[in-house]
Amino acid sequence: MSIGSMIRWLLAWAAALVVVWSFFEVGMRLWREHDPSDHRTRLVIMQWGDASEEQIVEGLKNQYEKEHPDIKIERIHANDFDPKLKTMMAAGTPPDLFYLNSDDLADFATEHLITNLDPLIADMPDGQKWLDGYYPVLLNAFRFDGHAAGSGHLYGIPKDFTTMLMYVNCDLFKQAGIAIPYGGWTWDEFFDDCKKISKLPADAAGRDYGAVFNAWPGMIQCLMRCYGGDLFNGSDFTHITIDTPAGIKALSVIQQARFVDESIYHSTGPQSGSYGEQLFYTGKVAILGPVGRWQTPHFRGVGQNDEGITSFHWDVVPLPHEQKAAVNIATVAWTMSADTKHPKEAMQLLRFLAGARGQEVVARGGMAIPSLRAVAESPAFLSGKPAHSQIFLDEVKDSYNPVFPSDPEFSQYMTDDISECLDLNQESPKQVAQDLSTDWAHEMASPLKTKQYPPMRWMPIVAATGLMIAVAVASVWLVSRRQKLGALDKKMERVGWLFVSPWVIGFIGLTLGPMVLSLLLSMTRWTAMTPMTTAQFVGADNYKEMATYDFQEHIKPALLVTGYYAALSVPLGQLAALAVAMLMNSRARGITMFRTIYYIPTLVGGVTMAAIWLWLLNPTYGLINHILGPIASKMGTAPPDWIGSDADRWAVPAMVMMSMWTVGGGMLTYLAALKNVPFSLYEAARIDGASATRQFFTVTIPMISPLIFFNLIMAIIGSFQVFAQVFVMTGGGPKNATLFYVIYLYRQAFQFHNMGYASALAWVLFLLVLALTGIVIRGSKSWVYYEGLKA
């Protein structure tokens, strides 16, 4: 046996052993988790958080196992917490206990995914006394009455929280001659102070800003409450009341400060918040807020690579008020799955995890406020910077938990609509308020929200599928029996089926099966947070919804954005790849190194590439605008804010520009095709007097036209499936400037939990791409030349 053959055999055996070991390891893992000799009660807990929070929960877990030898705890930490949790729930294997944000309570409680803790607490001898140790507003944040949070049954025990307030640069306040408002201030005073500070003389590092103001939906609601209004009239969330004097006032004062006074730092796009925080960190912003306690460790310098703020004196002040004080809070609780098999044991563990031990550690770290009064009011929380930490606790008396509809679509609607006013400055507050009211009214009137549907009948479908598979297998067996084959032919046929079986099984199980299932799901209403047995049959209503209001509001804009991107990226990408391949096809010295350099970017993952381009496209310190700045200034203009305030014009071209970074993949295939063009054809063309340009169009293009055709189809398909970069960089915003079709599909499936509607969107995308591919294939007959099919 030759060395080459030996290496191939070794690689084949190694691959086979890896596959076998993988299955064995998974099986052993399941066996270890369910070891029949281990009679301890097994509880699974799930959390998010940084390394310090992981360490806290791991320490609590070990301590509890030590004190309760009959309990075995498995801790799961997930950065992609929501997708993993919802996948586990849909699979019917949720963790017993897990973190739950107060914003998600209504969503989980409506779907009956979490346990009502009231009966379990009632069984405790000191249950009510234990609850009395927590701030009531926090407990109310995890009560749900079937319609809204704030009252009703208790579904979670808060582990920590934060009130929203303002971090201030005391030195800038002193320079502007403004007293630091420790005792409280109004919103009018806040905006006046911002104007005064923004007029301070600029230094070498640039001008100073009055504030970085976080105008998320919860903050708009808080501002409306201060002005005597609220987002909704009543707790049924059917009638939004932003189109009122309080709502218009809340939007107007922010728009005025950002775009007229320019006293508040404003930058749209995904890095606007982090860059604003960095400006505060470096002393160029006087007020950062409204934010919570989570900024404290960073400003203290607690992190491994954090130096903390040492160049100026910083502190915290209360949130401004107006007609009345209103302070929103953010809180997270330990909650119990509705499917836990050990509710009593899980409840005892929940009480321990939400107890004083862990909260004292969190308090000393400064990340959050303990939810237990005794710990929050102790030196563990109040000592250290900021000097006025007591303000966090004083704000509790005026605090409330932001209550939004259980439909996650509302937050997206509100974010998109107010973005046109507060981020893009394209619409007036009055118009934005009317748009949001109209959008929400249509959402509430949708048959998919109001109509009652029957359950999806899965058993007949499963039975029919099983019958079809049985008929197919029986047909193949009967045909093979009727064929009069010799022993050798039968053996060859069996070997053939053996070799093709991995593909057949994979195609049926991983491609055809999911396609059929998604087609069935497109006729259902299903959240994907519960087993598929809970799906409801809606018939063609998903498709009707797509063809009516949703088409104008979301689908049409998404198709226009995607089509615009495809129209630019497909031809430019193919031309760039072919041009680079022509250059790399030369015999110049060192050309191999250049081929490698051009190809390497294609190996970079989509998320990493998006992170790189976020920095490149940053309007303030990005490399691209740094290069374009001098050129633009000579033309009397400025470089665009690519994915920020100028996103409606420049976001898609920016995405196309980013796609050019990966032309190395196409270059490689074109280079291989160019190497296969017979040199004799070029010699014959030169003898006939053809110029280099004529040789390119009459020899090169026809000979590589099959590959051009293939790459064209793949590029069209790829351009309609752009996701990772856009999701990381913009999430589809601002407004709908980067709302690619697949981004909208993702929103429906995993943010709004409308998996049935998302499946319908996926089938429309499939048919659209299929139609475009068919058009290209039909048109290829006139320009694609196949050497093997020549006459």
Predicted regions, residues:
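Conserved C-terminal helix/tail region of periplasmic/extracytoplasmic solute-binding proteins
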Residues: 3, 8-12, 16, 29, ...
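A structural signal for multi-pass alpha-helical bundles of membrane permease subunits
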Residues: 495-791
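Short, solvent-exposed loop/beta-turn-alpha elements that line the ligand-binding surface or hinge
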Residues: 118-134, 183, 201, 229-249, ...
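Extracytoplasmic/periplasmic substrate-recognition and gating elements
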Residues: 72, 90, 148, 176, ...
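Glycine-centered hinge/linker elements that transmit conformational signals in sensory
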Residues: 193-194, 236-269, 319
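Hinge/lid segment of periplasmic solute-binding proteins
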Residues: 103-165, 311-318
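Extracytoplasmic/periplasmic solute-binding protein
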Residues: 144-159, 164, 174, 189-239, ...
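Long, aromatic- and glycine/proline-rich binding clefts that accommodate carbohydrate-like moieties
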Residues: 314-317, 364-416, 420
